[in-house]
Amino acid sequence: MAETHHQVTGPEEAPKPTPLFEAAVLISLALAVLALFLFAWLGNEVLQGDTQHFDLTVRSWIHGFASPGMTRAMTAISLLGYNILIAELLIAFAFFAWLRWRRAAVWLAVAMAGALALDMTLKYAYHRTRPTAYFGAAPHSYSFPSGHALCSFCFYGVLAGLLSARTKSLAWRLVIWIVAAVLVIAIGLSRIYLGVHYPSDVIAGYLAAAVWVGTVIVLDHVRKVRSSRRIAG
């Protein structure tokens, strides 16, 4: 327990904002705006059918790595992106409760509720039919954007943002973000490998999630700054 508190802050407490951290928040906001424009552009390309060559080429290339062992691994990785998110959320909430990070738990809940709503809304807006799955039957929902890519990005991205903002060690902040990035990328690749999404679906999921994650991180930072000012005043 003592070791944990050397790495993370106490209940509802965050490290004092530094120029580096302030810059990171501004970068998050800028990336969210950029992701919004890129998603709009990609969505239009999909509706026009202009991503077909790219999608088929990448799908074929990734499928070239198929093997029984790889399929088992990718199936397991894919579960982390959607199917067992409820269990992962409960673990995260329990961790936040242990550290008495009530507001962090609220932000994570808001982020995931928004992610699910965003996924359903965008799928029905674009009505893209799924590709033929390589292993088993494809899900019955629409294909664009990838819900696994969107939800995993939101969950691990917001979780990394909340943890790193409340972690004192710069080294641990880097570790948190690296682990989150590896998980998100692996989950996206697993959906392409299994054949249940086009590559453009996965990219779109990442872009949509980046908009939402950037928004949540900025709002969390604004809340902490206002709280600090009230305490100081």
Give names to the regions the model predicted.
Residues F39, G43, M70, L118, ...:
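Alpha-helical membrane-inserting segments
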Residues G10, P15, F135-G233:
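Membrane-embedded catalytic cores of phosphoryl/pyrophosphoryl-handling enzymes
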Residues H53-L56, E88-L89, F95-L170, L174-I178:
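Membrane-interface loops
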